[in-house]
């Protein structure tokens, strides 16, 4: 019975949820760790500042490999208006400071290795933050060598986060740098994925089902009456981060395979995604100062941004940092309920990582900025989970739902995630951000063999014909080696979602006119005031004949820059007949160049609700319907092209087979924004918005006609019975009764007469008063009242 109850809980949960979360887990043990030896800053004074360009070399002990990092300032990691807000333990603003770019030596560049011949060969990218320069430099960051990421961390950080089975350190005093590779993490022989306890036999405990035990792979058909769950949104685990993650509207399996490697929909020119980060008390407490905490956040974003730049042409840029004091409050403030000491339900506590995400999401929902998303940095974990993220919430403002401390299943969904501090925090951050951009997990051996995922539609396959991606990419369900890029499938999925508008992109800005923290900096890839163009450093500008990388001015005769302006062809403005953005259908008209500018006009689409075909309407620039979206997303699991929407009311994708009209099929999906829903409203981020009470009543009546008819008939019958009862009662009260009247003792009157009948008898014997004499004879019992002359007609006697 217990197993049966558990199974029911799993099915009910999986079948009813439409928004969900992904959870990362900590890495497994390290097989090897190296010490960074002989670091040298190649400047005359061995000194650098925030705007320096320099080379940095060092050895990897004990391999003795010589590494060179060719570095330059990363100016676009901080926005011009970037600030840090210091909060007190109650969540009130203590002070606000501008983040000065000169205070943060943040660099980007390329990694090189030296061959035995002495020749340097470029082998990857590098992102570094310099803590100390001089003859004994100290830096942290990440670089890649042939797609294998190399993490450089300070000894103090390694000691604090060291796993029990990690290699021990010697007794060398002082602070120095350590390095480990992705390939140094313990791996299974079959797939190269990290071994974890979470990968053991799946557990099924209804009491802890809410988050990391959930799987949105389960889509069994359920009767409608059994398809109600207390959960409004779906949370799944990312590591084993967990089965999958697909929030919002996710393309079906055919779409995932068809878009592998496609960048159609992603920006052709650099875009900037502004983000906000909050450091809670547990995170701040791991650093010697608030300045160190700030530097670590900048380092994390600096490293993660490179993956998005290379894959999607989007830079992640810090707009605001909030830092809470290192001393955690005894009782969390209502202003910052997420700011609590570490607590774990599994260990008898009551505040999990999922609770932090819920309360943080509610906090983020009150912010009025235009940031792409917000991240909460913490030092807490739940068991071995180190990250959670809501799916497909890029650029989403506000919040759906509200966390209730009395109800563990209540959830608030917003553009937010939670990242725990680890020795590879940047990877967790990049992975969680990938879910906010709408990516599902890459397929691994477990997902490919899952019987509830027969067509591999809930994960990104390696190729159209191969399921298992073998743990090589950023959206792998578990941490693994050589993870430095998104898979071709993830790139295709995110780009296609941008093209189809199943994620918002309105918060992404162009690199033109974006102020950076350092003001005008030629070579940072952002076109600022006083610059015509900026193609980046000289390496990035190779082959660019339109822009001079040294002056950031157009070359002689150039009107625009092909690399940064969509309406620029051969350094000249494209003609007005040039299509700079193609149409994706009848609801998305093409845009053409103006002929006098290098910029493509804003992307516009037809108004939602407009007719675009038989039984089709425009929604988010697509010509579609509820039935068509059901066919696209769940058709291969239901009835193919015969699949139809279960009803016309909600915004979660619920479908049915016409042959089984009472069986409801659901997935972790929502209808496109602009799709009609109940009460005359339209779907917006998974919620029905704009409905009216009158229309909702009308819709409810139309959806429940049998009930309405039954109630009406029953009420009518009761009313008729009541009326009939009243009529019968009234009739009984008014019916005359045949009762004998008592004798009336009254003086008899002489019968009336009329002159036409002659004189009455004994007329000659009148009484002295002239009145006829009275007969002493009583009238009959039932005689009518006496008639009086002039009032009643005379009575005739026979």
Swiss-Prot record:
Listed GO MF terms: metal ion binding; metalloendopeptidase activity
EC numbers for this chain: 3.4.24.-
Side of membrane Cytoplasmic, spans: 728-798
Keyword Ribosomal protein: no
Gene3D superfamilies in UniProt: 3.40.1620.60, Collagenase (Catalytic Domain) (3.40.390.10), Disintegrin domain (4.10.70.10)
Subcellular location(s) of the protein: Membrane
Active site: 432
Glycosylation sites recorded in the entry for this protein: 32, 226-227, 313, 407
Transmembrane regions: 707-727
Name of the featured protein: Disintegrin and metalloproteinase domain-containing protein B
Originating species: Trichophyton verrucosum (strain HKI 0517)
Highest classification ranks of the organism: Eukaryota, Fungi, Dikarya, Ascomycota, Pezizomycotina
